[in-house]
UniProtKB/Swiss-Prot annotation:
<dbReference type="InterPro" id="IPR019833">
    <property type="entry name" value="Mn/Fe_SOD_BS"/>
</dbReference>
<dbReference type="GO" id="GO:0005759">
    <property type="term" value="C:mitochondrial matrix"/>
</dbReference>
<keyword id="KW-0464">Manganese</keyword>
<keyword id="KW-0496">Mitochondrion</keyword>
<dbReference type="InterPro" id="IPR019831">
    <property type="entry name" value="Mn/Fe_SOD_N"/>
</dbReference>
<dbReference type="InterPro" id="IPR036314">
    <property type="entry name" value="SOD_C_sf"/>
</dbReference>
<dbReference type="Pfam" id="PF02777">
    <property type="entry name" value="Sod_Fe_C"/>
</dbReference>
<dbReference type="GO" id="GO:0004784">
    <property type="term" value="F:superoxide dismutase activity"/>
</dbReference>
<keyword id="KW-0049">Antioxidant</keyword>
<dbReference type="Pfam" id="PF00081">
    <property type="entry name" value="Sod_Fe_N"/>
</dbReference>
<dbReference type="GO" id="GO:0030145">
    <property type="term" value="F:manganese ion binding"/>
</dbReference>
<dbReference type="InterPro" id="IPR036324">
    <property type="entry name" value="Mn/Fe_SOD_N_sf"/>
</dbReference>
<keyword id="KW-0809">Transit peptide</keyword>
<feature type="binding site">
    <location>
        <position position="170"/>
    </location>
    <ligand>
        <name>Mn(2+)</name>
    </ligand>
</feature>
<dbReference type="InterPro" id="IPR001189">
    <property type="entry name" value="Mn/Fe_SOD"/>
</dbReference>
<comment type="similarity">
    <text>Belongs to the iron/manganese superoxide dismutase family.</text>
</comment>
<feature type="binding site">
    <location>
        <position position="30"/>
    </location>
    <ligand>
        <name>Mn(2+)</name>
    </ligand>
</feature>
Amino acid sequence: MTSQTHTLPPLPYAYDALEPVISKQIMELHHQKHHQTYINNLNAALSAQASATASNDVPTLISLQQKLRFNGGGHINHSLFWKNLTPPGTPANDIAGAPALREAIVSRWGSHEAFVKAFGAELLGLQGSGWGWLVSKGGAKGRLEIVTTKDQDPVNAPDVPVFGVDMWEHAYYLQYLNNKAGYVEGIWKIIHWAEAEKRYTAGVENPLKL
């Protein structure tokens, strides 16, 4: 029995394209090293799972679940993350290009500014490693909620991850050091609102095929 092999998705922009918000050095390490490691470990776990399934090795199958969840979640989360970022100052970074999502945000939080403040508070309140997400509950065009997930836990269906922010230290520390608030403030300059609009209105069929 063979298992599916996952590969590192290419970035939709150059490694230095998100500067000055996220440095080229961080993007290279984050994409080529951290994301690649999740993929390597996921592929190894899937291969072990296939062998254990073929031999009906139930204890091994059980022991592999945490590795699959952690590394599979890391692959899913990062694959979504790269696509919900865009170079600063581009049309895709303008929330005007996300009319349905903007209307839903204003309806839920009163204003775009109030949403940004609430989202930032959730990100800065996250203890340890994890992610912050804007989620459409129950599917496309659902009620918007700000949620956090620990470690590499992904957003689970039927909820839709409209966009996410990586709050692991490897996402910002080389540039911002302990100024996590600076990273959170800057992230809005590179959010891909057009991509967020697409996810909000149409959902995410398969994050590993985005």
